[in-house]
């Protein structure tokens, strides 16, 4: 299948149109028209080769929402017209112990990432959701619940599952004592999910700048980590702390906040941690397909709908909407036309605000 994507050719190049040849459908494949694709900060890291393993041309995008347009001969889960979602994985061996128990992200043979990876069979480079069409194994497509706004569902595929997985793994429920460090794209998801699970939620940040936003999202309390007295009073107060901060930082000051048998899960960290005790935290990869299906259920998904109106980028990179994306603000995600990809993607450079954004294919309603 020939389709159009948007790729970067080098670590310092902007996104540009790129012709993609999607594979012919295998028996268990579905082909989908991409309607929306979330913009994750991982996309920028990969495009800029921040981690040293980017393969160019690189087509980012792993928060993908679309509709099925064709199915393979053995597909049983989906039919043409179904709304589906694809996250950061598109394949795994499906027979190892981890895959059999729904932990495909821990596949013994290695899972296949949606982009910047190699197909398990052909070894061709995988290209992501910044494109008009995608072909994926049916086991790695998720059904989008009826009635859910497709644009707002996209960030569930990365930010959503990344924060939902530890809440589910550590059995958070009514009365659970949860701390969330940071209030960007991951942090606001963690707060809304934990609140929906009935937990008692405290948001932590260096200053009080995000206090009002945290409380508006449903958090019970706000804790400024630079307030020594408040931090001391909070000792032993949490059974789970989810650290969503995406830059190098010292986690040691948060360890005393954990109760006996408490856990600090680091989901936002990029790069090396400052000195710390590795026995005091967990760093699981984003959840498996089973977790993703739970995260995308109608009840959980509806709770994550953004309250803000969608923003649109203008072609003028100095236009007001572009400044709004560049500025540090409280908005969480924006549906954006793919035709405006240049100004938006470049607007993220050097500004790791952690917000989740969504691009819309310009041929979609």
Report the location of each language-model feature.
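Glycine-rich beta-strand-centered segment in the early N-terminal region that forms part
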Residues: 23-37, 50-100, 105, 127, ...
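NAD(P)H dinucleotide-binding glycine-rich loop of Rossmann-like/cofactor-binding domains
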Residues: 77, 93-181
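Glycine-centered, small-residue-biased loops immediately flanking beta-strands
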Residues: 262-263
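C-terminal hydrophobic helical "lid"/dimerization subdomain
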Residues: 1-3, 294-352, 356
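Adenosine-nucleotide cofactor-binding segment
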Residues: 174-183, 188, 193-253
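Rossmann-fold NAD(P)-binding glycine/threonine-rich loop
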Residues: 268-282, 294-302
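Helix-to-beta-strand junctions that scaffold the AdoMet/dcAdoMet cofactor pocket
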Residues: 258-259
């Amino acid at each position: 299948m020939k389709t159009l994507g948007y790729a970067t050719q080098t670590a310092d190049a902007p996104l540009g149109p790129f012709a993609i040849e999607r594979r012919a459908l295998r028996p268990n494949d579905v082909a989908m028209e991409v309607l929306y694709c979330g913009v994750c900060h991982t996309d920028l890291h990969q495009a800029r080769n921040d981690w040293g393993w980017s393969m160019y041309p690189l087509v980012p995008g792993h928060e993908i929402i679309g509709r099925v347009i064709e199915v393979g001969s053995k597909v049983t889960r989906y039919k043409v017209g179904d709304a589906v979602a694809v996250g950061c994985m598109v394949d795994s061996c499906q027979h190892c112990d981890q895959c059999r128990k729904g932990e495909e992200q821990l596949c013994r043979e290695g899972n296949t990432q949606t982009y910047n990876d190699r197909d398990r069979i052909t070894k061709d480079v995988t290209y992501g959701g910044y494109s008009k069409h995608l072909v994926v194994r049916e086991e790695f497509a998720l059904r989008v619940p009826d009635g859910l706004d497709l644009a707002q569902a996209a960030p569930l595929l990365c930010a959503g599952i990344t924060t939902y997985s530890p809440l589910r793994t550590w059995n958070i429920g009514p009365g659970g004592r949860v701390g969330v460090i940071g209030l960007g794209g991951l942090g606001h998801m963690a707060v809304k999910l934990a609140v929906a699970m009935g937990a008692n939620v405290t948001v932590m940040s260096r200053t009080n700048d995000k206090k009002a936003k945290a409380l508006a999202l449903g958090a019970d309390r706000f804790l400024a980590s630079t307030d020594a007295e408040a931090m001391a009073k909070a000792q032993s107060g949490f059974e789970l702390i989810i650290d969503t901060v995406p830059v190098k930082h010292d986690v040691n000051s948060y360890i005393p906040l954990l109760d006996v048998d408490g856990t600090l899960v680091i989901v936002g960290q990029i790069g090396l941690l400052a000195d710390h005790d590795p026995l005091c935290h967990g760093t699981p990869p984003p959840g498996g397909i089973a977790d993703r299906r739970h995260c995308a259920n109608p009840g959980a998904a509806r709770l994550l709908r953004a309250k803000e109106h969608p923003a649109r980028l203008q072609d003028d990179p100095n236009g007001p909407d572009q400044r709004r994306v560049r500025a540090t603000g409280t908005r969480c995600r924006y549906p954006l036309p793919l035709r405006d990809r240049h100004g938006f993607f470049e607007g993220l450079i050097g500004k790791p605000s952690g917000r989740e954004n969504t691009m819309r294919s310009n041929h979609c309603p």
